[in-house]
Amino acid sequence: MRIRPATAEDFETIVCHRIAMFRDMGYPAAVLTDIEEVSRPILHHSLANGGYYGVLAESDGASVVGGGGVLVVAWPGTQPQRAWIQNVYVVPEFRRRGIAREIVRTLIDWCRARGFHSVNLHASTDGRPLYEQLGFEATNEMRLAL
C-alpha cells in the first residue's frame, strides 16, 4: 500500500469516497444527494486553487482503496487559516489494516509542515477511537440546527 497526493484527475474518486463515508454513517439517500450537490463545486474549486490537499491510498495492485484530505479555510483567530481533516474513507474490504491511520498521519504531517498549530475534524462514531489514539481531543464546539 502506498499513500500518494491526490490530483485534479482524482476529483470523482474524492467525491465518491465522501458520499460513501456519509452513507456508511447512515445518512439517508436524500441527504446524500444534497451533500453531493453541495460538495462537488466546493471540492472542485478547492482542488484547483490549493485549498484542499488530498491523499489517496493505493493497494499493491494500484487500485485506490481509501483517501482523505485537508480543507484549508480562512479563520479569524490566532492563525489566518484553519485546517480541517475531511473525507477519511477506506473501502470496507481494506479496513482494519491501518490504512486510515496512515492517511490521517500523512495529513497531520502536511499540516505541521505548513505551520498550522492545530488541525480539526468532525469524527464519526467509528472513527473516534482512531482519532483519540492519534491525540485528537474533544472540543467545546456546539451546533444549532436551523
Predicted regions and their residues:
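A short beta-loop-alpha structural element at the N-terminal edge
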Residues: 2-16
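Conserved GNAT-fold acetyl-CoA-binding loop/helix
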Residues: 19-42
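A short helix-loop-beta-strand connector motif used in the catalytic cores of GNAT acetyltransferases and
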Residues: 44-56, 84
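Conserved beta-strand in the GNAT
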Residues: 56, 63-72, 84, 89
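A conserved beta-turn-beta hairpin within the catalytic core of GNAT-like acetyltransferases
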Residues: 73-85, 95
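Conserved catalytic-core motifs of GNAT/GCN5-like acyltransferases
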Residues: 75-78, 120-126, 132, 137-146
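Conserved acetyl-CoA pyrophosphate-binding loop and the N-cap/start of the following alpha-helix
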Residues: 94, 98-106
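Conserved GNAT acetyl-CoA-binding A-motif
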Residues: 111-123
